[in-house]
Amino acid sequence: MPAPEPTRRAKKDASASPSPAHPASRELVILTGLSGAGKGSALKAFEDLGFYAVDNLPIELVPRFAELVAQSVEITRATLVVDVREGQSLAKFPQILQEVRQTLQTTVVFLEASQAVLLRRFSETRRPHPLGREEQVVHAIADEKQRLEPLRNVADMIVDTSRFNVHELRAYIQSKFTREGNAKSMLITCMSFGYKNGVPLDADLVFDVRFLPNPHFIPQFRPLTGKDAKVVRYIRKFEQTRTFLDKVTELLLFLLPHYVHEGKSYLTVAFGCTGGQHRSVMIAEEIAKRLGKKSYRVKAEHRDMPR
């Protein structure tokens, strides 16, 4: 199935807060979302990571499944799919999720994509929408969004797969759920973006760097990016740039050990400028280098930088 890009959100209500009493070695991932958004590909990615995978388990059986995983000798990580085929039972999901979280550390991952992308995928695969052949796909998508709203509202991660292909979705799942043994195993993503394209939904921390001088208005810098040495030197020469880098680094070095202590396995720190080409790219690269020197697992991603 064609293409799936990301998003993440942590809910603060009781239904979305994993119990801290559960051992970190055991976990359940509930995979849900819109038809055509890539649940099948994501499920295979979880299987490749060693998760015990179940497709479309009835909602009423999820608490019992969680108990079996919690008691199992062989299964320590499991994922299951809940989708629109559950019908009216979907309204019960938030309550059932609270029950499951009393048994097992649980993460809800909700996959979605833009309407245009979903329509293209259904057209390319020639598969009917699960809500019916006779209904226009555009109406079926709208109906499905409404039915799945209770699940989306309690999701820990909302992943927009519009920009992903199958391989990129697989890599994204692996980057978020691969386990490492060292104390700094949390994966930190320093992401640049352009505000004109919206704030990344998977960002945990967002910094607006539009206060920095903009290289876009200097003709020789306009076709370059924040990874080019000339642009880097230009942005770095300003005192506010150096002060900002130092203060953000100091803040992150304070925050990161606390995130690790709370069991967080991934963190996305996003830096935004107008277009996502110069300032945010330079800052994301520099912060990633600084954190890497402190032995954190870190990578830089540039959502909107021209390639």
Curated annotation (Swiss-Prot):
Residues that coordinate or bind GTP: 83-86
Signal sequence annotation: none
Biased composition (Basic and acidic residues): 1-14
Entries under Gene3D superfamilies matching the protein: P-loop containing nucleotide triphosphate hydrolases (3.40.50.300)
Disulphide linkage map: none
Alphabetically ordered keywords of this record: ATP-binding, GTP-binding, Nucleotide-binding
MF-aspect GO terms: ATP binding; GTP binding
PANTHER family tied to this protein: RNASE ADAPTER PROTEIN RAPZ (PTHR30448:SF0)
Family: Belongs to the RapZ-like family.
Name of this protein: Nucleotide-binding protein ACP_0619
Source species taxonomy: Bacteria, Pseudomonadati, Acidobacteriota, Terriglobia, Terriglobales
